[in-house]
Curated annotation (Swiss-Prot):
This is Uncharacterized protein AF_2240. One of its GO terms (molecular function) is metal ion binding. It holds the Pfam family Rubrerythrin. Coiled coil: none annotated.
Length: 63
């Protein structure tokens, strides 16, 4: 698996986690929903970091 494929898979997994947390949140009590909101925000940050790294990998690949 190439670094680019690894990063793409990681991004996909983060997106799936967001979907899962969003589904759970619909049935959660208030405190748990707040925790799930926090986890969703963390997953979004992870996606940003992974996308930034993916851009770098692609730029280096072009050289």
């Amino acid at each position: 698996m190439s670094p680019e494929e690894i990063l793409q898979k990681a991004i996909e997994m983060e997106r799936e986690a967001i979907e899962t947390y969003a589904e759970m949140k619909r049935e959660a009590d208030r405190e748990t929903a707040e925790l799930l909101d926090f986890l969703i925000s963390q997953e979004r940050e992870h996606i940003k970091l992974l996308n930034d790294r993916l851009k770098v990998v692609r730029l280096l690949k072009k050289e």
